[in-house]
């Protein structure tokens, strides 16, 4: 291989009084060796250094939709800095009772007792996410660059406990209006997160729930699955509307509210306004609407349907979306399911105008 080092020889000094001047005695010094950069070194030097980012990815969706299986597959087949499980020990071991079992059994209680148990348990479930999130350091999200970036993946986002399941309980008549409001006010989104919202066929989702045979889920029915799927549809359509909101001091309270409740009726804004107590002032409704909007605008929701894909294809799809999406957050849940799916159309491009 040719040596990339060159020898530098200093020029001879010329005497002004004699054109045939002799060499300067200082010319006897040792040659100076210079390093000539190789082509690869020159190219690397011209490329600006890109600092490594650490992105936390959340997977979210209905129980049984395939979150945990996907979660485990991602962890086993992709470099993951940290994998954050659901805070299951909080729910099943550390509290005085198994609150997952209690909240499922509460459906058989009289209405007043049912409301008290469900609301209490849902708050315990939600606060457990705060304990888990306290150890996660997040940076401002950016498109994922697999050559330099690393990701962590988390099973569920706090959005599930503070928003999705409370909406589900409200739709099922197990939450009062003000109990739903309390959970929505308690939700606080500080960082910019992106959530993969896993969707799927309700019948296939229920089949997977029955297949894994968890004791606390024996009471799960197709109505339960449909209600929870509807809650996530409400969140998605609400998020679309929230991203369009811009505050204006020129608009009146009524004009502001009119903006939020316009469009598809299947938004949280419309539900909260339509079901509001007659004694609740409109300004209180508007304050909550603005709060919900500000929280949801910090999320990037990516609706996907992986039920019809084998896991290797689903992983490639997930990686592609990470690269092109500005920020990542996703949900995943522990479940043992195979790749059998319902024969339903896969529509990754969710159209919020179709929400009825």
From Swiss-Prot:
Catalytic reaction equation(s): thymidine + ATP = dTMP + ADP + H(+)
Quaternary structure (record): Homodimer.
One of the GO biological process terms: DNA biosynthetic process
The UniProt record lists the keyword Flavoprotein: no
Sequence similarity: Belongs to the herpesviridae thymidine kinase family.
GO molecular function: ATP binding; thymidine kinase activity
Active-site feature positions: 86
EC number(s) per entry: 2.7.1.21
Cited function: Catalyzes the transfer of the gamma-phospho group of ATP to thymidine to generate dTMP in the salvage pathway of pyrimidine synthesis. The dTMP serves as a substrate for DNA polymerase during viral DNA replication. Allows the virus to be reactivated and to grow in non-proliferative cells lacking a high concentration of phosphorylated nucleic acid precursors.
Name the record gives this protein: Thymidine kinase
Residues involved in ATP binding: 61-68, 208
Top-level enzyme category: transferase
Organism field: Elephantid herpesvirus 1 (isolate Asian elephant/Berlin/Kiba/1998)
PANTHER family per record: DEOXYADENOSINE KINASE, DEOXYNUCLEOSIDE KINASE
Keyword terms: ATP-binding, DNA synthesis, Early protein, Kinase, Nucleotide-binding, Transferase
Region Disordered, residue ranges: 1-29
Positions contributing to substrate binding: 122, 214
């Amino acid at each position: 291989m040719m040596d990339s080092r060159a020898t530098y020889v200093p020029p001879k000094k010329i005497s002004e009084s004699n054109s045939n001047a002799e060499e300067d005695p200082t010319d006897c010094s040792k040659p100076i060796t210079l390093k000539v950069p190789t082509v690869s070194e020159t190219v690397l030097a011209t490329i600006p250094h890109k600092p490594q980012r650490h992105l936390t990815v959340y997977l979210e969706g209905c129980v049984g939709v395939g979150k945990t299986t996907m979660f485990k597959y991602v962890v086993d087949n992709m470099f993951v800095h940290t994998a954050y499980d659901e805070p299951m020990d909080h729910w099943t071991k550390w509290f005085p009772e198994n609150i997952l079992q209690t909240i499922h059994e509460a459906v058989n209680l009289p209405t007043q007792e049912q409301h008290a148990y469900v609301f209490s348990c849902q708050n315990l479930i939600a606060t457990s996410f705060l304990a888990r999130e306290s150890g996660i350091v997040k940076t401002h999200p950016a498109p994922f660059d697999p050559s330099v970036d690393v990701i962590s993946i988390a099973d569920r986002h706090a959005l599930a406990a503070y928003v999705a399941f409370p909406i589900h309980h409200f739709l099922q008549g197990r939450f009062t209006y003000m109990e739903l409001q309390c959970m929505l006010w308690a939700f606080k989104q500080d960082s910019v997160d992106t959530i993969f919202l896993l969707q799927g066929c309700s019948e296939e989702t229920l089949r997977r729930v029955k297949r894994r045979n968890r004791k606390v889920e024996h009471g799960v029915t197709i109505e339960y699955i449909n209600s929870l799927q509807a809650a996530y549809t409400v969140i998605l359509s609400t998020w679309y509307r929230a991203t369009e909101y811009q505050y204006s001091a020129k608009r009146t309270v009524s004009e502001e509210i009119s903006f939020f409740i316009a469009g598809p009726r299947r938004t949280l804004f419309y539900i909260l306004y339509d079901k509001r107590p007659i004694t609740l002032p409109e300004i209180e409704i508007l304050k909550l609407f603005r709060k919900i909007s500000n929280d949801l605008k910090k999320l990037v929701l990516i609706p996907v349907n992986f039920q019809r894909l084998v896991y290797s294809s689903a992983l490639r799809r997930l990686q592609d979306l990470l690269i092109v999406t500005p920020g990542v957050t996703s949900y995943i849940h522990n479940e043992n399911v195979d790749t059998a799916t319902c024969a339903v159309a896969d529509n990754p491009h969710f159209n919020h105008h179709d929400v009825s």
